[in-house]
């Protein structure tokens, strides 16, 4: 889908250490966040995936898009099961509203945290932390 929409995916690794996480859970988290970023980004845009060490024992991963953003009302519910934003319901984007709930569950099971920062109409930055080995 990223090729069809001509979206560049840019990876910026800036962390030290190995991630202490179940590889399948980590892969599922990344797939869900990247799939959403692609789905809600405009054609001919970019998605940034970056890693950093904000706290010595954790790695922080961000997935940043330049899609429609998330309204303040929707932000409080974005990780709830079956929740879809108003903008998602108004488009042809398919989804069950489970992807971000799964992300939250998996990140919590890995002893990490997850959140979102955004500016409506300027995209979203989803982030999560997981422990380092």
Model-derived features with residue positions:
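Conserved catalytic submotifs in the C-terminal HATPase_c
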Residues: 3, 8-17, 54
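Acidic ATP/Mg2+-coordinating residue in the GHKL
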Residues: 65
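A residue-level detector for a conserved hydrophobic packing site
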Residues: 26-30
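Short helix N-cap motif at coil->helix boundaries in the Bergerat
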Residues: 69-80
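Short helix-loop "hinge" at the ATP-lid/N-box region of the Bergerat-fold HATPase_c
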Residues: 37-38
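Short beta-strand/loop element within the Bergerat-fold HATPase_c
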Residues: 44-57
